């Protein structure tokens, strides 16, 4: 598989290393200092792109891939205010892309567990819920895309919660996301339901970035044969 990397930070470099080790060819890596080289890539020399760039570059990157007919797996977060525009563009151009706030298989299982627990807790009185995340200090978005996905999974089942807020809150209708940035943490997420008599907690801890990178490569392998706007659920159902 011929992979074009859009963004070449820590995740891009790790994907490069792992993909090459798996026998794939990384045909190029595009970053802020060599963006003019993007024009040399097209669907004849590139099978799929993986985007771990910056929020301000993601939309342009996705549209470029769609224009070139190159499927793109997008792990960049912080650009979702423009997702509806990108979705419309993809449909109009008959393109292919998949956005995921997290490509780790373990985290996506955690997403499902979170939704199931929220459904179980929806009829339980006396419990309040909050979420907590810890990431490395170079993590630019707060809360993380993963935390937002977890919060949305809770909100769809708990009718007494109306929105998430990225702070401690005394408003019973708000779901608190507490964000901490501590090196060298790759990523920890906790969901805590607490009452006067007990507490129920679920937690996911990433020991390294490798799970995210391996997941992105696996998704890219699958996505190159797909068409349209895809989700991680579509990929997981294919396993």
Where are these regions (language model features)?
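Rossmann-fold NAD(P) dinucleotide-binding segment
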Residues: 41-42, 48, 55-75, 84-86
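Rossmann-fold NAD(P)-binding glycine/threonine-rich loop
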Residues: 63, 76-97, 108, 113-117
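Amphipathic, non-transmembrane alpha-helical secondary structure
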Residues: 39-40, 59, 63-67, 111, ...
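Short, acidic/turn-prone active-site loops that include or flank metal/cofactor-
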Residues: 31-35, 76-80, 103
């Amino acid at each position: 598989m011929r992979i074009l990397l859009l963004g070449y930070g820590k995740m891009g470099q790790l994907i490069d290393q792992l993909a090459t080790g798996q026998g794939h060819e990384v045909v190029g890596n595009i970053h802020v200092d060599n963006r003019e080289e993007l024009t040399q890539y097209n669907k004849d020399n590139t099978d799929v792109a993986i985007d771990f760039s910056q929020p301000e570059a993601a939309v342009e990157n996705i549209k470029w891939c769609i224009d070139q007919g190159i499927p793109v797996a997008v792990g960049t977060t912080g650009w979702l205010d423009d997702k509806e525009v990108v979705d419309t563009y993809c449909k109009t151009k008959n393109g292919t892309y998949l956005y995921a706030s997290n490509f780790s298989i373990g985290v996506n299982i955690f997403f499902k567990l979170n939704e199931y627990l929220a459904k179980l807790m929806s009829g339980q009185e006396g419990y309040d819920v909050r979420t907590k995340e810890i990431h490395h200090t170079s993590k630019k978005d707060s809360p993380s895309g993963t935390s937002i996905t977890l919060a949305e999974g809770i909100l769809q089942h708990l009718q007494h919660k109306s929105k998430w807020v990225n702070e401690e809150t005394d408003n019973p209708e708000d779901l608190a996301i507490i964000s901490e940035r501590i090196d060298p943490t790759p990523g920890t997420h906790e969901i805590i339901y607490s009452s006067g008599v007990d507490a129920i907690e679920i937690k996911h801890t990433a020991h390294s970035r490798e799970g995210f990178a391996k997941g992105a490569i696996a998704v890219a392998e699958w996505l190159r044969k797909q068409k349209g706007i895809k989700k991680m659920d579509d990929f997981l159902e294919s396993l």
